[in-house]
Each structure stands twice: as structure tokens, then as C-alpha cells.
Amino acid sequence: MIYFGLEYGWATSCKDILLIACGSATSWIVRNILRNKGGLHNRVGTRLKIFPFTLHECEEYVRERRLAYDRRRIAECYMAFGGVAYYWSLLGKGKSPEQNFNQLFFGPQDGLRLEFDELYSSLFKNPKPYIKIILELGTRRAGLTRDDLRAKLKTANGGRLTRYLEDLEECGFIRKYLPVGGKNGGTYQLIDNFSLFFMEFVQGNPSREGDYWTAMLSEGRKNEWRGKAFERLCLEHVPQIKKALGISGVHTEVYSWSRAATAAVRGSQVDLLIDRRDGLINLCEMKYASAEFAITKSEFEKIERRIEAFREVIGAERTIQLTLVTVRGLKPNVYRNDVQAEIVLDDLFAP
């Protein structure tokens, strides 16, 4: 609770004094100041939420620091750090992203090895329940519903879980996406790049050799991570995707969709659907490859099955546009002709 003197007595007779409250504990500010039910109620003049850097802003920062990274390497750093300026400030000049990963996560010095626990401890007075939620969500790429989380965490107090989820969402660690139509329910998904990178490669890893990322970790494992992380990168830059599609001025709703596998049907998942007011739906497939991405016959058949499964939900009257988001574009072949829109990494760097 805010101190009584601040709420009712401090500077009450001074019209030229402003109180500026700032901090990284977004949920605390929302609960105690913006939604204050006491003396601060309805007294907030201006709200200014500071968002993480976008790829465009990270590129400007990299250029300012003379790090000499191309866009693919900037994107790889973003997939590990997100847009948190502090993490970017730790990148050593004259070192590649791979060398920086070695030093910050796997070197003999602590670097960012202790950051995970310190991060949540700095934001939340009692970090344990928040970390439990993060760890649980980290095991499910598509996310979990509130009821699923409650069952897995064996939490009896549903109201408290709701508050924890709201706090994590306010702080940008998780997102809640609604089912197609956006009526009821919702799924919580971990989207914090640093937490996901830490949980996949650093947590429980005793390596202090300083070359784990470049020498000991297989390229296949890294590419698997890049594929998943690139999808999150796209989810964090939907306005840029809309701009590249030429629909910045069109009202849209953004969804994800999944269908669990049963004995009768295959499981299916689409991470990004852009539902447009003009009646079209961009079904986005996000594919990471260091060169041009080639749509193979088997890959195209998988995409077709996803489209047909999704069409069963929305009905035949809606128009679905297959949209491919890749790093360097699509390799020309017969299957490329069935793609209605192409987005490349450069498009995600738009302001």
C-alpha cells in the first residue's frame, strides 16, 4: 500500500510539483498507483509504458556502438536477449554473437548465469510462484490454459494464480492469446526470449569452458532453437509484418490456434493468424533458414493439412492467405506459387 502521507498529504498545496513514479516492476505500479483505490485514485496525469527495443531500435543501438553485426546476427541476439537494453549493453565489441554467448552464459565468470533468479527476485517480493509458472510454461511451446496451469501447479487458490498471471503479463514475460473469435478462455504462453534461452541452454548446464556455444553444442540443436525463437521474433513484430503486407491501416485481430491430436484427427497448430476486417485471414508460417527457404513436397503437404484443419473451424466462406515469413526469402519452385505473400527478415527491421 502507498504511504498515507503520499496519498493524502504530500504536496497537496503545491500546484507546480509532479510525482514521477518509474521502475521495472510494472505490475506493482499498475496495482498500487494506476489502480489505487485510495488517495491516488484518478490522479494519474500521464501513463508512459516503456516497451523493449524492436529489431529496428536494436540495429540503431548496434550501429551506435560500432558492433558491426549484420541483420541475421542482430536477429540471433534478439532471439536470446529480446529487446532488453541492459543485455545488449553487455555485448563485447570485436566479438561475434557466438563469442558473446560463450562469455555471458558459459564462461568462467558469472556473466548472465545468475540473471534468471535475480531477475524475478528483483521484480517480485515472493518470486517462487512466478518462477514455477515460468518453468511450467517453458515446457509447452504452445502454452497452457489457466485451468491446465492450476492442475499442473496443484494450486488451490485460483484468485492468487490469476494475480500471478496478470503480473507476469504486465511485465511482458507471458502473453495471453484468445481462441479464434476471441470470445472465451485463453492460453498463456511464455514469450520472454531471455527466460526461454536460459531454460533451454543454461539451466542445469555446468559448463564453464567458455566455448560451449561454438564448440560443444551441435549445429542441429542450435538450429532447432533458432526455428522456435524465430517464430517468437515474428510474434514480437506483428506491426512490421502488417506494414509489409500493406495492411497497417486495416483493423486486425491476432490469434494463435491449435488442435490437440485424438484417435480421429491429427494435432495441428498455427502460431500466427492475422484476422483482418476486410474479410481475409493471413495464416503465417514462420521458417528459419540461413539461405533461401525451399518448400518441399512434404512441408507443403503439412501446411495444406494445417490450412484445411483451420478451415474446418472458421468455415469455407472466409479467405485464407498463406503467408511465409523467412530470413532470406523463398527458393523458386512449384510450391512457391501457392504462397500468397512473402515476408523476409529485412521487413521485420522496419521502424
List each language-model region with its residue ranges.
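Phosphate-binding site recognition
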Residues: 1-215, 220, 322
